[in-house]
Amino acid sequence: SRGFGDVYKRQSKLASRFGKKELATVSCIVATVLEVICFVLKPTNVWVYVGFFCAAFICLGFFNTIIWAMITDVIDDSEVRNGIREDGTIYAVYSFARKLGQAFSSGLTGGLLTMIGYSAATAFDPEVTMGIFNISCIAPAIGFVAVALSLFFIYPLTKQKVEENVAALAQRHNK
């Protein structure tokens, strides 16, 4: 637990140095690589499997904490572009989108389990357990890739743009 705390304490410094978008993108790429390696190796030792997932989800933890700071950057960018600060509206849209994503992923999980033939009667069949393993590696890897690509190609707030927005708002508010 202390080790994880130390990792996350460094996150703020890394985000300041490289940028939030950049750090979030890299954390998703590293998580993808870890998931793919786990899928390819198919570890038979449960602790090796757990190790891969702990490492991948430390990366997810980076993203999940950075995203909250990125919301503030979006609010600042909106204020620079529109001249009004819309904290509540932007946060509400983000919160709603997050809830939609969580609902979708919950439904997807059930659908994937059905697709591999999971039921109470087949829970320990080798084909089903291998299917669960495959889903547990492939589904997160696909999600991490989708997030990394979205951040890289769609999310416009690079470190430089965020710094420009901060300067513009400082100048605007000091008048």
Kindly give the residue locations of the regions a language model identified.
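A membrane-interface helix-boundary motif in multi-pass transporters
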Residues: 111-142
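Loop-to-transmembrane helix entry/capping segments in MFS-fold secondary transporters
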Residues: 78-94
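Short, small-residue-biased leader/transition segments that mark boundaries at the very start
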Residues: 1-8
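A gly/Pro-rich, aromatic-decorated transmembrane alpha-helix motif that marks the paired
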Residues: 100-116
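Hydrophobic core of transmembrane alpha-helices in multi-pass small-molecule transporters
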Residues: 47-66, 70
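Intrinsic disorder in cytosolic terminal tails and internal cytosolic loops
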Residues: 155-175
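C-terminal ends and interior cores of transmembrane alpha-helices
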Residues: 30-44
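Helix-to-loop junctions at the C-terminal end of transmembrane segments
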Residues: 9-20
